Structures are given as C-alpha cells and as structure tokens.
Amino acid sequence: GTFYSLNTFYIASPDKDNSKTLNKALADGKNILFTPGIYNIEETLKVTKKDTIIYGMGLATLEASKGNVVMNVSDEDGIKVCGLLFDAGEKESTTLLQVGDKKTKVSHGNNPLSFSDVYFRVGGGKYAGKVKNCVTINSNNVIGDNFWVWRADHSTNVGWDVNTATNGIIINGDNVTMYGLFVEHFKEYQTIWNGENGKLFFYQSELPYDVPKQKAYKSHNGKVNGYASIKVADSVKKFESYGIGVYCYNRDSDIDITSAVEVPDRKGVKLHNTCTVKLNGQGQISHIINKSGTATENLGDACRIREYENGIIIQ
C-alpha cells in the first residue's frame, strides 16, 4: 500500500461543510476525508485533479438535495473514491456519480481511476428519491470494487411511480473492470454496458418486485417482455463476465421476462457461469442469455449456463 499523510486531507464534517467548502478544498488540491454523517449536497462536487483521494468513514452519505449530480469525477489519472453512500433526493437527478464528462480515447491504463465500496440508494429512507440513472462511467480504464446500486423495494417512500429510477449503472468507457457489482430493482435495464473490453467478476441482480402489469415492463419498443438485467450493447466486440446471477420475485403481477442477460452473439463476447433463480411470486424468467437457457417457472428454480459465446452454450 501507499502511505498518505493526514495533512493532505481536508477533514469534512456534516455539521460545518457544504458544497462550497468541499469544492474549495478540492480546488486547493486537497484529498477529502468524510467523517460519518449525512451531507446535503446542493451543488455538484467536482473532483478535477489527478490522484485525488475521496474517502468516506462510517458510510458517510452524500445526498442530492436539489436534483443535482452529487459528484463529477474528471477524466484524470489515479482518482480514488471509496466508502460513500450516494442518496437520491426528492427532485430527480440525471445521475448521482458521473465519471468523465463524455466518452474519449484517453487511456488511464498505467494509473486507473478506482471506486471501492460505493453505494447508491433511491428511496426507502427520508425521501422518495428520484434519479434517471445512478452511475454513469464515461472514462476508460476504470476499476470498480463492490458497488451496491439499489432502488428501494421496501420501507418508506417506495412505489413504482414513487421512487422512480430508470437504470442503475451505464458504462460507456472502454477497458472497465468491475469486481462485485450489485444492481437491483430499477425500472428498465439494471446495467447497460456500452464500452469495449469490459470485464465483470461477480454480478448479482434482483429485477423489480413492484411491476404493476406486463404492459409497463416491455423492452425493445414494447416488442419484448421485460428488461434484461444486463444489456451489453449490440456494437460491443469484446466483453467477458464471470459469475452472473439474476433473480426474480414478481410480487405484484404475473410478469414474464424474456431474457436475464442480453449480449451480441459474436466471438469475443464470453460469459462464464450465468444463472437465474425464481425467488418467489408469479411469472418467470424465460431464458438466461438471449434466447438460450431454460425458464425459471417454479419457486426455487435455478437455471444455469456454464459457458456462452456467439450463441453456443455449454450447460
């Protein structure tokens, strides 16, 4: 590991700090250490300098209080963010964490950006949170380790038209690697992966419990039942996953989900050990990957594909 003097950090406290004080510290070249508590973020926190460290203690919570992006991380080498909960506010945000303003050809292969133990919540607490998409990754060579991205399915301020959130995470950058990605209960695709050469190690996803009717949950311009949990873009040439689990509990209606995972059928797009499980409720997941794999028709059904590439499966 690397030693960093505490003198290089601005020590943040929810009792004294706001977006202005935090952004000033960042502009001055300080790392940020968030002490435990809830921070009302009224303006986007701008992490613009390479090798900046943003570190949260005790699950420090950053709340979007005015429909803003909570944190924008610039397309710079070596930025590290860890130990934070991003909370959607009452007014809809476009995203809570944005990494890079847009897709570029800039490589960070020698000094990747990294995000560890970061959590995202939409509803289930003080507010009926609203966001279009929790996490947007545009930069290349990003490493993610333990992301929990959650639209609330229980507790207070929860409902299909209450705590609204379309997607959990959208990955546009190339050479992005995720270790332990958990994405649950969003209203359309949980995860959209548009970048090339993505690698995913362990993915867990529950589809939304609270779909009111099949008509409200159809993809591909209403032609396909349900939304896959992971949608790898048709344009992607290389992608590889190890250990995907997608779970359904259609609590409120009899819902069919055509596929748990959608990927382009071509060599170079490889999936290892993919499974679906019916936890409870009505309906089913009809296929595991695209139109391959058996349906989860009965309570407790677990269906698996051991290897998949270019439409060829090994059970």
Show the residue positions of the predicted features.
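Extracellular/periplasmic carbohydrate-active domains that bind, remodel
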Residues: 1-315
